[in-house]
Amino acid sequence: MKMIVRRTALAVCTLVLAVILPTAASAACTGFDDLPETADCYESVMYLAEHEITQGTGNGYFSPDAPVTVRQWAMLLCRAYDVKVEGSSWSDLSQSAVEQAYRKGWLNETALSAPNIQLCRGALLKSAFAAAKIPVYDSVLYAGGVSLPDHENCIRIGKELQLCGEANTANEIVTCRDAAMLLHAILTRAFTVTAPEAPVTLVNAAGVNINDYLLALRQVPEPMLAAFKVAGWTYRIDFDYISDLSKQLNMSCIGATSYGQKTIYISEASATLHEFGHFLDYALGFPAEHERLYLAESQNSSLRDYAKTNSREFFADCFVYWITYSADKKRMDDFRDAAPQTYAYMKKLATNNWGA
């Protein structure tokens, strides 16, 4: 699966604190005194300037080596993607930009409390990718890959797309030069990112980045994934279906399993294990033992209240608990002490490859 992303520049904000929302078109830019034509960022900066994106730091200077703050970058993104900001001063306008960028998912919560901090390259790339809808997948999802932090995955993708150099690191502070070159690239170039192969039939009806969903599927035991695929089941990311179901049931749902349609419907990746617990219940033929265990031990278990409503929810949550905490001795001891028969039953299932 490949995703191609392309953006065309319409309007982009200033890179520097000194430039504040010009209300009238400026004269054609003739260059900056501190930016020779031989500079590697010259083309990018001139593109931004000619499109009235930046006027530099004043007095004919661009200051390419000046660090870029979260506040400045937020303004940049809001102008780039025509997001309205409000205020009568730079402080108000840029704070509005930070808040808007956060709402759009372009910046994280830290940006709200610390808008004046300087951006590192990993954060800059993550934000740019989010704004441009360029998907980032964890390296562990590819053959031979290992799990990496978000910023490291962004650096990896940045290098693959030639948006940063091989020597660049996630934690290094970025400058106006870096921001200008990155912005110019994501607004004017097309990018192709190959998605990792899903272990089951996956339908992305919501059209979202499937990274978190693929990571959630990695938690499901391989024998179950194989059985799911062989049985002709589908894992479907479908916000509309879940929303309609929530309204019908008058409750908040994030996942559902349809035995008739052989489909797991998901809106949040965190529901994946629970819904696969329902699939396992189905694959085992809804054993009477599950009802017996529910009646005998559910109320004394340490599981959430929802797990105590019926045998199917109890079994699904037992599966989630087992997969999530199987390496945590204390958690497993607590489970065994509270529900010894259920513990023994789940242990036997796990030992026997979950009935595969």
Task: Locate each region found by the language model.
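Active-site-flanking segments in enzyme catalytic domains
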Residues: 203, 216-356
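Export/targeting segments at the very N-terminus of extracytoplasmic proteins
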Residues: 31-32, 53, 212-220
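N-terminal propeptides
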Residues: 18-197
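Sec-dependent N-terminal signal peptides of Gram-positive bacterial secreted proteins and lipoproteins
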Residues: 4-26
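Alpha-helix boundary/N-cap detector
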Residues: 92, 149, 208-211, 215, ...
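Fold-level signature of zinc-dependent metallopeptidase catalytic domains
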Residues: 198-210
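Beta-strand-connecting loop/turn residues
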Residues: 13, 52, 60, 260-262
